[in-house]
Amino acid sequence: MLRHGISARLVDGYNIIFAWEELKAVAAQDLAAARGMLEDILSDYRGYHRCEVILVFDAYKVKGNPGSVEKRNGISIVYTKEAETADAYIEKTSYQLRRDHRVRVATSDNLEQVIVLGHGSLRLSADAFHAEVEETRGQIAALIEQYNRANRGRNTAKIKE
């Protein structure tokens, strides 16, 4: 489980994919590619914010599916088991984590938002989460640029030696 006190983000994967235009366009051609793009985006987000990210995808319609949890690029990726929706998994997990962690849930499902808010979690609509992710991307780009500027002279000095 998570280290005590660490902040957690629970992300309703398909809800986000079909709410964000850039992912929705990719999903229309290749859903697996859209999932991969979201994983990459959230991996960068996790690294910058130093939080735990749990990305949840529905797999409840897959007959006999036991569900799975994988750790890739620092984020937990959950595929729900047969007869368990992403919403049900997010509700259960936000309830379990609420006591020892600051939990934020990213989804535009209104009922889901009300339920997790009742558990004491914070909620983010897909649009609000997209804005936060874009701001994070800008901050990461600025840090990289600042690092590159600071090290430009050092790298050329080493090459000349």
Q: Which residues fall in each region the model found?
A:
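Nuclease catalytic cores that cleave nucleic-acid phosphodiester bonds
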Residues: 1-11, 15-161
